[in-house]
Regions:
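Core segments of cupin and vicinal oxygen chelate
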Residues: 2, 8-51, 91
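Compositionally biased, intrinsically disordered low-complexity regions enriched in proline and serine
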Residues: 5-7, 22, 41, 59, ...
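Vicinal oxygen chelate
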Residues: 12-15, 64-93
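Short, solvent-exposed coil/turn elements at secondary-structure transition points
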Residues: 33-35, 59-62
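Short, charged/polar surface micro-motifs in flexible loops or helix N-caps
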Residues: 48-52, 61-63, 82-83
Length: 93
């Protein structure tokens, strides 16, 4: 048997990303790992209900924005509180 484990985003500002995913979606860190040489940090965020995690990769020396190209990608969530989250996201801009 095989199951979906995680999805990854590379981020430039780890704390800003952590704050965003917490406020926007209620995702909290469930595991962290830092490279022995300090070159990168991984933070795995979970929803507290499923085993799926979002992995944020922070390359400590990276300063320029990532070129996301023209490929489409997305991360999907389900909720029975659509209006609540929609309002929160509108307020966040």
């Amino acid at each position: 048997m095989i199951h979906f484990a995680h999805f990854n985003f590379n981020v430039l500002d780890l704390q800003r990303s952590l704050d965003f995913y917490d406020k926007a979606l209620g995702l909290k860190p469930v595991k962290e790992s830092t490279a022995a040489d300090g070159s990168f940090k991984l933070v795995f965020l979970g929803d507290g209900m499923t085993d799926f995690v979002l992995e944020l990769t922070y390359l400590t020396d990276r300063k320029e924005a990532y070129d996301l190209g023209e490929g489409e990608f997305h991360l999907a969530f389900e909720t029975d509180e659509y209006e609540k989250f929609h309002q929160r996201h509108k307020e966040m801009g």
